[in-house]
């Protein structure tokens, strides 16, 4: 084959550091635009950026010429600095992302569901904690959790977890 064909959709999640201030609702839409702009600068196509006061979901295509971790670090770093420069209520130094992030592959056939899931973050988090959301996504994408959870903890979590209380199956 003479040409490389590449299209990898990624559902990424950034969460604020435990000592960080929450994302100000007054800055939220501008902040999402800034995050989108930074992904585009990295050669990514962005489908949606949306989140909640403590985390942000991004659905984008990965640039085949860059490692994912470089894209994520760049966007986290620049967007963190942008937020710090625009948050006049709490002080510039009080907003910080966690260094860790989540990144899941999304097939073209699952794009509509992933987009819907991200678009409806406000509704989802009325009934679901961030950590339950992450655990569900990890299970859905078969992420190995054995280092962080015992089998008993996972069985307990699986028995109580259900998306039925959200009103629609999102993923």
PLM ranges: what are they?
Residues 1-171:
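Basic nucleic-acid-binding interfaces
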């Amino acid at each position: 084959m003479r040409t490389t064909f590449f299209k990898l959709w990624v559902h990424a999640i950034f969460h604020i550091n435990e000592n960080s201030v929450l994302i100000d609702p007054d800055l939220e839409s501008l902040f999402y635009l800034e995050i989108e702009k930074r992904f585009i600068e990295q050669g990514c196509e962005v489908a949606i950026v949306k989140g909640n006061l403590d985390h942000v979901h991004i659905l984008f295509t990965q640039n085949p010429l860059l490692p994912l971790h470089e894209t994520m670090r760049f966007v986290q770093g620049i967007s963190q600095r942008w937020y710090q420069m625009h948050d006049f209520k709490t002080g510039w130094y009080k907003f910080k992302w966690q260094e860790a992030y989540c990144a899941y592959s999304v097939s073209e056939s699952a794009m509509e569901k992933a987009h819907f899931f991200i678009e409806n973050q406000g509704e989802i988090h009325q009934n679901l904690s961030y950590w339950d959301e992450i655990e569900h996504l990890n299970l859905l994408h078969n992420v190995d959790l054995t280092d962080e959870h015992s089998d008993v903890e996972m069985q307990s979590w699986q028995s109580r977890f259900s998306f039925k209380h959200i009103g629609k199956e999102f993923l």
